[in-house]
């Protein structure tokens, strides 16, 4: 079975080669998201990555659309994807990475790391005039308990 696959993800050469080797009967085109062309979207049976909605909606034969975001609401509107198109998304792909980044930012804020960095860049070595804060016993409000919102409290041991 021959399929035409448009990949709109920033893949390196090794990942491209691995993808092509996994299904040698498929034909691939690789575009970085900032450089997606309408003719490539119209050519494709499968689109991997968030091609512009305006282009996706013009492809009436697309069979599978893989969104690289967890919230693909724009693609779910009537008329964007054909009725028989399978759509998948990246729910669950970012919870660990983003929640660890959030934890790093929270620690940085609590410990005034950004103020210290700014003072260091200005060659000011005076201490910051306020008590040091920590995260032990701190309270955090998580709004939204999707993959990221439920991962963050676990990382913070709350």
Predicted regions span which residues?
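Phosphate-binding beta-alpha-beta segment of Rossmann-like dinucleotide-binding domains, i.e.
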Residues: 83-139
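Loop/helix-junction capping segments adjacent to catalytic residues or to phosphate/diphosphate-binding pockets
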Residues: 13, 38, 95-96, 150
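Rossmann-like dinucleotide/phosphate-binding beta-alpha-beta segment
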Residues: 130-158
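An N-terminal-biased, well-structured beta-alpha scaffold segment characteristic
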Residues: 1-88
């Amino acid at each position: 079975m021959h399929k035409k696959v448009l990949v709109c993800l920033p893949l390196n050469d090794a990942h491209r080669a691995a993808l092509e080797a996994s299904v040698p009967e498929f034909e691939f085109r690789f575009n970085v998201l900032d450089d997606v062309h309408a003719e490539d979207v119209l050519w494709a049976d499968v689109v991997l990555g968030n091609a512009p909605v305006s282009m996706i909606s013009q492809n009436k034969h697309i069979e599978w659309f893989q969104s690289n975001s967890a919230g693909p609401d724009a693609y779910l509107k009537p008329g964007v994807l054909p009725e028989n198109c399978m759509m998948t998304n990246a729910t669950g792909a970012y919870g660990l990475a983003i929640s660890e980044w959030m934890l790093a930012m929270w620690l940085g804020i609590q410990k005034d790391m950004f103020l210290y960095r700014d003072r260091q860049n200005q060659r000011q070595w005076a201490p910051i005039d306020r008590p040091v804060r920590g995260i032990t016993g701190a309270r955090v409000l998580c709004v939204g308990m999707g993959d990221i919102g439920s991962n963050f409290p676990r990382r913070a041991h709350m």
